[in-house]
Amino acid sequence: MKKAVILFNLGGPDKLENVEPFLFNLFNDPAILNLPGLLRYPLAKLIANRRAPTAKKIYKELGGGSPILKLTKEQATALELKLNSDDNLSDYKCFIVMRCWHPRAENVVKEVINYNPDELILMPLYPQYSAATSGSSIKEWNDICIKNNFKVKTSTICCYPTD
């Protein structure tokens, strides 16, 4: 049985010139700014433009970009190895989706369709549930799956344990 594990994270700009587009994606999310698109889009542009200079300074201190994709790839590799070594009946493959930067759900859904799994396991890497993080990521994923007529048994691992 083939199982696809979809790891969700926020994402982050990979280089300084991508800080403003990343911020725009963040603030253009209806779960962040709950406004009609005609208002949300220009407001997201304005906020991203105003916050970009300060955010660029912070990302510059981090080496010029966010480490989140690299770290999430390391987590995905370790999880895939562990799952495949513990379960001889299933073949697991981990995929990464970033909500506000690359790789985006739109592209990853196509990769998952090509993998042709029997089951999907959605696993947000946010430490707790929030409509603006886990909720938004899962909604975007489900919307894109519907758009691509991709239907497969799906389960969701929501949040980290509290104890």
Label the predicted regions:
Residues 1-163:
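Active-site-proximal alpha-helix that buttresses catalytic centers in soluble enzyme cores
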